[in-house]
């Protein structure tokens, strides 16, 4: 089944800004998160949303998706199997020079040590886990050298032989007609897949591959302060090296599940807290939740809806240490929806002392008041 367009998944246009993509992701991830939405299919929908956001929130991956319609899982990670174009034709300036000048200056030893491929793992974190960090254990399927043949691919007691087709070079020269005439192009030997070796008797465990897929448990220490879309490198935990080369690296990409109450911007946290009309008018002290615990906040008399208070040091620890962000508390004045006659009379008396005209029947005083407090 073909994957849906990532922009369609998030409900945004292809020209959407990074902020629009982030807002769409937050809204949808709250709606379909498996801990909140128990409907059938919500889990798959959440995975689809996370996959789309992971691609479109990264400028490099988004550009690749816009151009090719897919994202290379190794995009942005060095040491792997290389992106871009592969196969026949010219693969770069070296190939062009090889073609016209005999190809003798770029011969590589197919048996030289090579670094293993890098791996990528997506780790989903709860909002507070990203803020305070955690110790986690993850399972990674990866290719490792076969224990039976020690990576040679040959049956124990035997050794691989030099490939009879390429003479152990791992490549063969192929004549090709081009607009410049007949030229010779170097191709990977299809008989030995570029290894320069032939295995007459294959290892019964790995069937001649020299490598097997194993699931490795890896302990990962998630640092405090990581944010959505950031990645962490775990050195040497990628796939095994080839011909004795070093292992690749593991890149852990973090996807942070949005919180229903707190909203994060960099290392600062924003919350909206409701207060009553009386509290806003006369002032009060209220309890405000923070990720660090409950804090008392003084509301001055005459506070207007939308007023922002800063709680210093109650935000996210800086990823590289040295301080903590702040929490910004935005108050929303809640207008009572139902008033009895006595309460209405008190408000009319109050309005008359300030010179306001009150005509509930013609002006819809309370509706206007509600809209004003909401900022409409």
Swiss-Prot record:
SMART domains: DnaJ (SM00271). Homodimer. Zn(2+) 2 binds at residues 163, 166, 189, 192. One of its GO terms (cellular component) is cytoplasm. This is Chaperone protein DnaJ. Belongs to the DnaJ family. It is found in: Cytoplasm. The J domain is necessary and sufficient to stimulate DnaK ATPase activity. Zinc center 1 plays an important role in the autonomous, DnaK-independent chaperone activity of DnaJ. Zinc center 2 is essential for interaction with DnaK and for DnaJ activity. CXXCXGXG motif repeats lie at residues 146-153, 163-170, 189-196, 203-210. The keyword DNA damage does not apply. Participates actively in the response to hyperosmotic and heat shock by preventing the aggregation of stress-denatured proteins and by disaggregating proteins, also in an autonomous, DnaK-independent fashion. Unfolded proteins bind initially to DnaJ; upon interaction with the DnaJ-bound protein, DnaK hydrolyzes its bound ATP, resulting in the formation of a stable complex. GrpE releases ADP from DnaK; ATP binding to DnaK triggers the release of the substrate protein, thus completing the reaction cycle. Its cofactor is Zn(2+). Keywords: Chaperone, Cytoplasm, DNA replication, Metal-binding, Repeat, Stress response, Zinc, Zinc-finger. A zinc finger (CR-type) spans 133-215. It comes from Listeria monocytogenes serotype 4b (strain CLIP80459). Binds 2 Zn(2+) ions per monomer. GO terms for biological process: chaperone cofactor-dependent protein refolding; DNA replication; protein refolding; response to heat. The lineage of its organism: Bacteria, Bacillati, Bacillota, Bacilli, Bacillales. Zn(2+) 1 binds at residues 146, 149, 203, 206. Residues 5-69 form the J domain. GO terms for molecular function: ATP binding; heat shock protein binding; unfolded protein binding; zinc ion binding.
């Amino acid at each position: 089944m073909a994957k849906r367009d990532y922009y369609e998944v998030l409900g945004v246009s292809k020209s959407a800004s990074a902020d629009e993509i982030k807002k769409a992701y937050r809204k949808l991830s709250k709606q379909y998160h498996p801990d909140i939405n128990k409907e059938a299919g919500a889990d798959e929908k959440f995975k689809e949303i996370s996959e789309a956001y992971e691609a479109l929130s990264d400028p490099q991956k988004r550009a690749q998706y816009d151009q090719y319609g897919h994202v290379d899982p190794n995009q942005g990670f060095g040491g792997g199997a290389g992106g871009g174009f592969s196969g026949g034709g010219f693969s770069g300036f070296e190939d062009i020079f090889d073609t016209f000048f005999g190809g003798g200056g770029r011969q590589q030893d197919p048996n030289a040590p090579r670094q293993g491929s890098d791996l990528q793992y997506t780790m989903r974190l709860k909002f507070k886990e990203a803020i305070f960090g955690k110790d986690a254990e993850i399972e990674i399927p990866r290719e490792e050298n076969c224990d039976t043949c020690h990576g040679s691919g040959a049956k124990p007691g035997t050794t691989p032989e030099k490939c009879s087709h390429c003479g152990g070079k791992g490549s063969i020269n192929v004549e090709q007609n081009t607009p410049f005439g007949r030229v010779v192009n170097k191709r990977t030997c299809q008989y030995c897949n570029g290894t320069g070796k032939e295995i007459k008797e294959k290892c019964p465990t790995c069937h001649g591959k020299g490598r097997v897929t194993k699931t490795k448990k890896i302990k990962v220490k998630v640092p405090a302060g990581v944010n959505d879309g950031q990645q962490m490198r775990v050195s040497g935990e990628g796939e095994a090296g080839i011909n004795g080369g070093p292992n690749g690296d593991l890149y852990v990409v973090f996807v942070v599940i949005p919180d229903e109450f707190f909203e994060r911007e960099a290392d600062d946290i924003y919350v909206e807290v409701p207060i009553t009309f009386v509290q806003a008018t006369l002032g009060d002290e209220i309890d405000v939740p923070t990720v660090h615990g409950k804090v008392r906040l003084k509301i001055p008399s005459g506070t207007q809806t939308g007023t922002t208070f800063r709680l210093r040091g109650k935000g996210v620890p800086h990823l590289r240490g040295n301080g903590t962000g702040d929490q910004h508390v935005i108050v929303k004045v809640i207008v009572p929806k139902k008033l009895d006659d006595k309460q209405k009379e008190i408000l009319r008396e109050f309005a008359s002392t300030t010179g306001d005209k009150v005509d509930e029947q013609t002006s819809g005083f309370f509706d206007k008041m509600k809209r004003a407090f909401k900022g409409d």
